[in-house]
Amino acid sequence: FGSLAAKTAEVPSRVLTILTNDAARYSILGQRNGLHVTSATQTMMIVDMETQDAEDPWLSDDDLKLETSRTDGVHHAVVSAGEEVAASGRVFVVGHTAIFDNIVTSPAYQRRGLGSFIMKALAAQAFEHDVDSGLLLASLDGQKLYSHLGWRMVCHVLMLSTSNEGSDLSVG
């Protein structure tokens, strides 16, 4: 751990991310090695992709539009209201695992089901590949949504850096 902490400390913006079920232990080890907790609120979650909807979802609001694309093997989904992005996310496949990332709903569009919608749109794109499981890192708010969609927690995600500002790097 000491050598990883030293490498992390070499660059102020570098973050050491630890997947663990013993966050307290690594928080203490980090402190002993000059690192501070910059996030302890995320979890890693998985899902059996057989439980996910394989069809493109339908938007019930005519003012919203779904656009999907694929760039360099990464599938993107964006829901927009005119020129404004209401929700977005991406998924890429490694082996038989769909890795969901950067799922965001703009504050003005939250509590309208767009997070679920984006996840379903991305799952439909992931099914273009032979996928068995899904994987993601979830914020506190995301954990509620993903649990509702059948995802389960595997472990906690602890982020350590030399920054002592106490800001949660998992937000935003």
Identify what each model region corresponds to.
Residues 1-59:
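Acyl-donor-binding surface of acyltransferase catalytic domains
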Residues 20, 36-47, 137, 152-171:
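Conserved catalytic-core motifs of GNAT/GCN5-like acyltransferases
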Residues 60-67:
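Short, basic/aromatic recognition patches
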